[in-house]
Amino acid sequence: MSRFSGALQLTDLDDFITPSQECIKPVKIETNKSKTGSKITIQDDGSYMQATSSGLQKLEKVEITLADCLACSGCITSAEGVLITQQSQEELLKVMNENNLAKLNNQLDSVRYIVFTVAQQPILSLAKRYNLGPEETFERVAGYFKKLGADMVVDTKIADDLSLIESRNEFVERFNTNRQSMPMMASSCPGWVCYAEKTHGNFILPFIATTRSPQQIMGVLVKKYLAKILGVPGDRIYHVTVMPCYDKKLEASREDFFSDVDNCRDVDCVITSIEIEQMLDGTGIQFLQTVEPSPIDWPWPTPRPSAFVWAHESSGSGGYSEYIFKYAARKLFNINIDQAEFKILRNNDLREAILEINGEVLLRFAIANGFRNIQNMVQKLKRGKCNYHFIEIMACPSGCLNGGAQVRPNSGQTPRELTAELEAMYKMLPQSNPENEAVEMVYTTFLDNAGDNNKRKEFLHTSYHQIEKMNTALNIKW
């Protein structure tokens, strides 16, 4: 029985994120009609040949692009089963090999500046896999990328901080002027956003925060701000992000994140933790310890930080709920809170924090991970019984540390046990303070002292789109 109501049908839905094996995107194949008939044969290399009276013709391979996937309402939560041609390690290695060859042949017009942006969750996943500390892991991963031909390897902290600050400001504005669009729901998880657009559409979209995810904020910083610092056009930069889930590939491919001015995407390629492991294995590197480390780059015009792998509040998914809770308490009610206490409700993936004074609830926040909890929240909202002001939503159980593309557990270890170890590592990281010199620098030098609201809206915020359900026989489940 489906856990979801109505006519919605999901494939392989549970809270263990695995690739979907079904795709119902209808593809029209143009064929030439022959009066004499034709015969199709499969060649030794797997290609298809059509024999007609006029000779042999090789049939084109059907490919489903990321744009097709985003515009389709067939599958809902998982992008892994789609043929992703532009977001793969093979495509990355191809681009880097071609770039290295262009450098070697002094073909300067063809050379691109390659920048890697690495999130902290993949670093922790790889650190656990290779039994290294997080900072050492990051430096050795950077060394590996530099050996492949990367020009720069940076962390995501500046984008993480900007996303938190913009989210907190958006929450306070909604609380003061637009209560009907509450609870405000976090927007950094592309699996959740994709599900919301395809399943609940215009009902749910006004509740989702418009603040971009850290990946997409970093895309703007690299293609526009860093490009200006380097004196390189944005379309000459090839921007790669390393993320903990496959759905980040879909997010990077949204048309909303394509710059018409620069004629390029903010993020060109997304690879994941498990793909890094596969790349290392493919080149015969069994131990990351054998890779020569390289310092993490810091291209921003502020002092270099003391560390490059940071924790954000209590959540391994960005810390949105706790950070916004504490800020809202101070900003709206002049109450200082050192640490928000999130109590476990029905399960470990559903928690809430309440700010209550003299019996009056001032703020009620929740963290809901996994689609079971997400669906319950949505149904409460539809029934008018959701009394939260903010909900941090992540599609994966336990959040981003347990992303669907993190390195798999060793034999004899369960995913839950591995996630617990990653959470313990995360709690040992230095604590980030989003209000820092680097973030202030972005606002003053790139966003014009934050006075240009149009610029902030364009670069740090986005919009969502309802995707109509296709009426096709391929949707029918028997």
UniProtKB/Swiss-Prot annotation:
Keyword Iron-sulfur on entry: yes
Keywords carried by this UniProt record: 4Fe-4S, Iron, Iron-sulfur, Metal-binding
An example Gene Ontology biological process: iron-sulfur cluster assembly
GO MF annotation terms: 4 iron, 4 sulfur cluster binding; metal ion binding
SUPFAM superfamilies: Fe-only hydrogenase (SSF53920)
Keyword Iron-sulfur: yes
Coiled coil location: none
Superkingdom classification of source: Eukaryota
Binding residues for [4Fe-4S] cluster 2: C189, C245, C396, C400
Positions bound to [4Fe-4S] cluster 1: C23, C69, C72, C75
InterPro entries on file: Cytosolic_Fe-S_CAF (IPR050340), Fe_hydrogenase (IPR009016), Fe_hydrogenase_lsu_C (IPR004108), Fe_hydrogenase_ssu (IPR003149)
Record-linked Pfam families: Fe_hyd_lg_C (PF02906)
Role summary: Component of the cytosolic iron-sulfur (Fe/S) protein assembly machinery. Required for maturation of extramitochondrial Fe/S proteins.
Similarity comment text for this entry: Belongs to the NARF family.
Name recorded for this polypeptide: Probable cytosolic Fe-S cluster assembly factor AAEL012261
Organism the protein comes from: Aedes aegypti (Yellowfever mosquito)
